Amino acid sequence: MKAAEFFQLPASLQPFASFFSPEVAPWEWLKTIGTALKAQDFSGGQAIPPGVYAEGQVYVHPSAQLPHTATLIGPVWVGPGTKLLPGCFLRGNVIVGANCTIGHNAELKNSLLMDNVQVPHRPYIGDSILGNGAHLGAGVVLSNLRLDQKPISVRLPSGVVDTGLRKFGAILGDKAEVGCNAVLNPGAVLGPRALVTPTVVLSGYVPPATIAHVRTTVHFVPRRD
Protein backbone atom coordinates (compact mmCIF):
# COMPACT_ATOMS: atom_id res chain seq x y z
CA MET A 1 0.00 0.00 0.00
CA LYS A 2 1.52 3.28 -1.17
CA ALA A 3 0.71 6.91 -0.47
CA ALA A 4 0.25 7.43 -4.22
CA GLU A 5 -2.86 5.23 -4.05
CA PHE A 6 -4.50 7.75 -1.70
CA PHE A 7 -3.39 11.25 -2.71
CA GLN A 8 -0.91 13.39 -4.57
CA LEU A 9 0.87 16.25 -2.84
CA PRO A 10 -0.58 19.45 -4.38
CA ALA A 11 1.37 22.31 -5.92
CA SER A 12 0.80 24.48 -2.85
CA LEU A 13 2.86 22.03 -0.78
CA GLN A 14 5.69 21.38 -3.25
CA PRO A 15 8.28 22.90 -0.87
CA PHE A 16 7.65 19.78 1.23
CA ALA A 17 7.74 17.26 -1.64
CA SER A 18 11.18 15.82 -0.95
CA PHE A 19 10.03 14.71 2.50
CA PHE A 20 6.90 12.83 1.45
CA SER A 21 7.58 9.96 -0.93
CA PRO A 22 4.56 8.63 -2.86
CA GLU A 23 6.16 5.17 -2.77
CA VAL A 24 5.95 4.58 0.98
CA ALA A 25 2.93 3.65 3.09
CA PRO A 26 0.87 6.80 3.79
CA TRP A 27 1.28 6.56 7.57
CA GLU A 28 5.06 6.83 7.10
CA TRP A 29 4.45 10.49 6.24
CA LEU A 30 3.51 11.14 9.87
CA LYS A 31 7.12 10.50 10.88
CA THR A 32 8.48 13.25 8.61
CA ILE A 33 6.07 16.15 9.19
CA GLY A 34 8.28 17.68 11.86
CA THR A 35 11.45 17.23 9.81
CA ALA A 36 9.80 18.76 6.75
CA LEU A 37 8.76 21.83 8.73
CA LYS A 38 12.23 22.34 10.19
CA ALA A 39 13.61 22.63 6.65
CA GLN A 40 11.25 25.46 5.63
CA ASP A 41 11.74 29.22 5.53
CA PHE A 42 9.03 30.75 7.71
CA SER A 43 9.58 34.32 6.51
CA GLY A 44 7.17 36.15 4.21
CA GLY A 45 3.93 35.27 5.97
CA GLN A 46 1.32 37.74 7.13
CA ALA A 47 1.57 39.54 10.44
CA ILE A 48 -0.31 37.82 13.25
CA PRO A 49 -3.14 40.10 14.42
CA PRO A 50 -4.04 40.88 18.04
CA GLY A 51 -6.22 38.16 19.50
CA VAL A 52 -4.39 35.36 17.71
CA TYR A 53 -1.80 33.77 19.98
CA ALA A 54 1.26 32.51 18.10
CA GLU A 55 4.25 30.74 19.59
CA GLY A 56 7.31 29.34 17.84
CA GLN A 57 7.65 29.13 14.07
CA VAL A 58 4.38 30.05 12.38
CA TYR A 59 3.83 30.81 8.69
CA VAL A 60 0.44 32.01 7.46
CA HIS A 61 0.21 32.83 3.75
CA PRO A 62 -0.71 36.48 3.08
CA SER A 63 -3.95 35.41 1.36
CA ALA A 64 -5.11 33.17 4.23
CA GLN A 65 -7.83 34.45 6.56
CA LEU A 66 -7.16 34.63 10.28
CA PRO A 67 -9.95 34.98 12.87
CA HIS A 68 -10.07 37.36 15.81
CA THR A 69 -9.17 34.49 18.18
CA ALA A 70 -7.01 31.41 17.56
CA THR A 71 -3.98 29.62 19.00
CA LEU A 72 -1.07 28.62 16.77
CA ILE A 73 1.77 26.71 18.45
CA GLY A 74 4.55 26.18 15.95
CA PRO A 75 5.79 24.80 13.84
CA VAL A 76 2.65 25.55 11.84
CA TRP A 77 2.36 26.22 8.09
CA VAL A 78 -0.89 27.56 6.58
CA GLY A 79 -1.24 27.80 2.80
CA PRO A 80 -2.89 30.32 0.47
CA GLY A 81 -6.61 31.00 0.61
CA THR A 82 -7.13 28.91 3.72
CA LYS A 83 -9.64 30.16 6.27
CA LEU A 84 -9.13 29.70 10.02
CA LEU A 85 -12.28 30.16 12.09
CA PRO A 86 -12.51 31.48 15.67
CA GLY A 87 -11.13 29.33 18.45
CA CYS A 88 -9.14 26.91 16.30
CA PHE A 89 -6.08 25.37 17.96
CA LEU A 90 -3.12 24.23 15.84
CA ARG A 91 -0.52 22.81 18.19
CA GLY A 92 2.72 21.69 16.66
CA ASN A 93 3.81 20.05 13.41
CA VAL A 94 0.78 21.09 11.38
CA ILE A 95 0.82 21.66 7.61
CA VAL A 96 -2.30 22.98 5.89
CA GLY A 97 -2.52 23.39 2.11
CA ALA A 98 -4.47 25.85 -0.03
CA ASN A 99 -8.14 26.81 0.23
CA CYS A 100 -8.93 24.78 3.33
CA THR A 101 -11.39 25.62 6.11
CA ILE A 102 -10.26 24.98 9.68
CA GLY A 103 -13.35 25.32 11.82
CA HIS A 104 -14.16 26.93 15.12
CA ASN A 105 -12.76 24.95 18.05
CA ALA A 106 -10.94 22.61 15.68
CA GLU A 107 -7.84 21.01 17.21
CA LEU A 108 -4.99 19.78 15.01
CA LYS A 109 -1.61 18.31 15.93
CA ASN A 110 1.09 16.53 13.91
CA SER A 111 -1.11 16.43 10.83
CA LEU A 112 -0.94 17.21 7.12
CA LEU A 113 -3.98 18.58 5.30
CA MET A 114 -3.75 18.96 1.53
CA ASP A 115 -5.72 21.41 -0.65
CA ASN A 116 -9.46 22.11 -0.31
CA VAL A 117 -9.86 20.17 2.93
CA GLN A 118 -12.98 21.10 4.89
CA VAL A 119 -13.03 20.54 8.66
CA PRO A 120 -15.40 23.36 9.64
CA HIS A 121 -17.06 22.34 12.94
CA ARG A 122 -15.25 21.18 16.12
CA PRO A 123 -13.16 18.25 14.87
CA TYR A 124 -10.16 16.64 16.55
CA ILE A 125 -7.43 15.76 14.07
CA GLY A 126 -4.42 14.09 15.65
CA ASP A 127 -1.51 12.46 13.81
CA SER A 128 -3.46 12.22 10.57
CA ILE A 129 -3.13 12.82 6.82
CA LEU A 130 -6.13 14.26 4.94
CA GLY A 131 -6.04 14.19 1.15
CA ASN A 132 -7.22 16.81 -1.31
CA GLY A 133 -10.91 17.67 -0.92
CA ALA A 134 -11.39 15.54 2.20
CA HIS A 135 -14.25 16.59 4.48
CA LEU A 136 -15.11 16.03 8.14
CA GLY A 137 -18.60 16.74 9.48
CA ALA A 138 -19.27 18.42 12.81
CA GLY A 139 -17.76 16.79 15.87
CA VAL A 140 -15.67 14.16 14.08
CA VAL A 141 -12.84 12.65 16.14
CA LEU A 142 -9.76 11.10 14.54
CA SER A 143 -8.59 9.28 17.64
CA ASN A 144 -4.83 8.81 17.71
CA LEU A 145 -3.98 6.80 20.84
CA ARG A 146 -5.06 3.33 21.90
CA LEU A 147 -6.52 2.98 25.39
CA ASP A 148 -3.70 0.58 26.27
CA GLN A 149 -1.18 2.90 24.55
CA LYS A 150 0.33 0.04 22.56
CA PRO A 151 1.72 0.53 19.01
CA ILE A 152 -1.00 0.94 16.41
CA SER A 153 -1.67 -1.62 13.69
CA VAL A 154 -3.58 -1.15 10.45
CA ARG A 155 -6.08 -3.84 9.48
CA LEU A 156 -6.01 -4.31 5.71
CA PRO A 157 -7.58 -6.96 3.46
CA SER A 158 -4.10 -8.42 3.01
CA GLY A 159 -3.49 -8.67 6.74
CA VAL A 160 -2.49 -6.65 9.77
CA VAL A 161 0.39 -4.19 9.44
CA ASP A 162 2.27 -3.01 12.51
CA THR A 163 3.05 0.69 11.94
CA GLY A 164 5.32 0.98 14.96
CA LEU A 165 3.54 4.24 15.78
CA ARG A 166 2.24 4.90 19.27
CA LYS A 167 0.17 7.81 17.96
CA PHE A 168 -1.62 7.51 14.62
CA GLY A 169 -5.06 8.87 13.87
CA ALA A 170 -6.33 8.30 10.34
CA ILE A 171 -5.47 8.41 6.66
CA LEU A 172 -8.12 9.93 4.39
CA GLY A 173 -7.63 9.67 0.65
CA ASP A 174 -8.62 12.39 -1.79
CA LYS A 175 -12.29 13.41 -1.42
CA ALA A 176 -12.94 10.99 1.45
CA GLU A 177 -15.71 12.13 3.80
CA VAL A 178 -16.69 11.44 7.40
CA GLY A 179 -20.16 12.33 8.71
CA CYS A 180 -21.07 14.23 11.86
CA ASN A 181 -20.01 12.84 15.25
CA ALA A 182 -18.30 9.80 13.79
CA VAL A 183 -15.21 8.46 15.54
CA LEU A 184 -12.36 6.89 13.61
CA ASN A 185 -10.32 4.68 15.92
CA PRO A 186 -6.51 4.80 15.77
CA GLY A 187 -5.12 3.52 12.48
CA ALA A 188 -8.28 3.95 10.39
CA VAL A 189 -7.55 4.16 6.65
CA LEU A 190 -10.06 5.51 4.09
CA GLY A 191 -9.44 5.19 0.38
CA PRO A 192 -10.19 8.01 -2.07
CA ARG A 193 -13.90 8.96 -2.12
CA ALA A 194 -14.68 6.60 0.77
CA LEU A 195 -17.53 7.78 2.98
CA VAL A 196 -18.26 7.09 6.64
CA THR A 197 -21.81 7.99 7.65
CA PRO A 198 -22.68 10.03 10.76
CA THR A 199 -22.16 8.61 14.29
CA VAL A 200 -20.31 5.50 13.10
CA VAL A 201 -17.41 4.27 15.24
CA LEU A 202 -14.95 2.81 12.76
CA SER A 203 -11.77 0.78 12.85
CA GLY A 204 -9.74 -0.61 9.97
CA TYR A 205 -9.85 0.01 6.23
CA VAL A 206 -12.56 1.41 3.96
CA PRO A 207 -11.87 0.76 0.25
CA PRO A 208 -12.05 3.57 -2.31
CA ALA A 209 -15.53 4.80 -3.31
CA THR A 210 -17.15 2.69 -0.56
CA ILE A 211 -19.72 3.73 2.06
CA ALA A 212 -19.31 2.53 5.65
CA HIS A 213 -22.57 2.73 7.59
CA VAL A 214 -24.51 1.03 10.37
CA ARG A 215 -28.15 0.04 9.90
CA THR A 216 -30.30 1.04 12.85
CA THR A 217 -34.01 0.87 13.52
CA VAL A 218 -35.89 3.60 15.34
CA HIS A 219 -38.95 2.38 17.28
CA PHE A 220 -41.87 4.64 18.17
CA VAL A 221 -44.01 3.84 21.22
CA PRO A 222 -46.76 5.91 22.85
CA ARG A 223 -46.00 7.74 26.06
CA ARG A 224 -47.57 6.25 29.19
CA ASP A 225 -47.97 9.39 31.23
Q: Which residues are covered by each model-predicted region?
A:
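Glycine-rich hexapeptide-repeat left-handed beta-helix
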Residues: 18, 113, 119-225
